[in-house]
Amino acid sequence: MDPHHYLIKFLRTSHTISAQQILICIIITAILLRVASALLLGNQVTVLPGIYDQISYDNLAQRVVDGYGFTFAEEHWPITRPGEPTAHWSFLYTLYLTAIYTLFGHQPVIARILQAIVVGALQTYLTYLIAEKIFAQKIGLIAAAISAVYMYFIYYGGALMTEPFYITAILWSLFLAMRMAEIDDFQQTIKFGVGLGIALGITVVLRQVFLLFIPFLFIWIWIARFRRRLHLSLISTGLSIGLIVLCVLPISLYNQSRFGRFVLLNTNSGYAFFFGNHPYYGTHFIPILHTDVYLSFIPKELRSLDEAALDQALLQRGLQFVFDDPRRYVLLSISRIPAYFMFWPSSDSSLISNIARVSSFGVTLPFMLYGLVACLGKKHVQTGNHLLNLFASPTGLLIVFAVIYASVHILTWALIRYRLPIDAVLIPFAAFAISNVFEQAKKKIDLVRTGSAS
């Protein structure tokens, strides 16, 4: 039979493929790529670019399994002494590894593969849901496809660090917030209030920095509901906040029992602010220094303090740096912007870091910016103040998150991996831009064909 017959038959059949089938294929692709990354990282936990923290989580989980609790056998970053309690690392992620090691023995590759499967499926699906909600189903599929093949997400998908689960939890929280902003039914608001509380609780226990965004999230929900003339859902908000407290409180009490002082979640904010704003930099931030350099910053009179006390003392010192020379702090913060949004290759980076950076953020950044600008100029409703309408829209929520989250790190300590949640949130805008570019190109091609035919 004529080969053209098969081609025509295939093209006709392809048009019958549903969006659901396409999405399933995209999700399977995302899972396979992340599982491949997990297998390449293997059963050894070694020093690799951008994922050094996995060594700490692996060691800490082994100590918990062996009955030593959250401690290290040797002096560990930042300056935690052997056998002394640590709260520097996410308890939830450590317990995830502990559960895997308890069930299967010290098999990091199993933790990697399970994580790759869960994150590959959920992060891709949530990206689709958010993009579909803001734009359209087609754009949701494009966004899911971008997320599936995004090199940073593939690389980190198998790394034993909080980032994969954390980014997924952020997307889950943002999507539930979008739903909360539009629901009128009381029972549904209660249902989504509970879901949002669980999502936010998981997110902050993975990385406490997200706590700084939560007030803005609820303010956005209230304003969005007010603009839609819906009740302010105070009961569902109270449920959400209550569930966050339930997630955080056990850790706070545990820290109190170990350190004899209040530690909300983790002992890392003081270290980060102190290290990130030390006069050593002058007005030019350097993202990564040698460990010995960081340790040399810590005053000798503070080195005898336990981890929690030292964290609080260093936060005070860091704030004093700002008060002593606010101009330097402003210039130093500005210098963090290129480091945070770096998309170009660097001779200081490894080959894998350069490939991941350029092939993911470097390729998608122009489309992200294109999509953002297009959305900023787009009218979401025909009446009312344009900026308020934009702010109260799901688009506005993603923009607010990106601005707040970037600002937090620009003002403290900026690393590329700290930007990855923003990448995930901006992917729907890149998908919108890609769709728009193809539509414009198609129109021009059709015009050329029409002109040629006439």
Q: What do the predicted segments below correspond to?
A:
Residues A30-L33, G140-M151, Y155, F175, ...:
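Short helix- or helix-capping micro-motifs
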Residues A87, F91-T98, L103-Y125, A144, ...:
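Loop-to-helix entry region of an early transmembrane alpha helix in multi-pass inner-membrane enzymes
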Residues T98, A143-A144, A148, K191-R207, ...:
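Membrane-interface alpha helices of multi-pass inner-membrane proteins
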Residues V109, T124-V149, I167-T168:
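Transmembrane-helix signature of polytopic, membrane-embedded enzymes
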Residues I113-F135, W172, L176, P366-V373:
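Transmembrane-helix motifs of polytopic, lipid-linked glycan transferases
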Residues L129-I130, I146, F165-I183, G195-L196, ...:
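Specific aromatic-rich, kink-prone transmembrane helix
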Residues I134-Q137, S173-G193, I221, R227, ...:
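Membrane-interface transmembrane helices that cradle and orient dolichyl/undecaprenyl
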Residues Q256-S257, F262-R336:
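Membrane-proximal stem/loop segments at transmembrane-domain junctions that anchor or position
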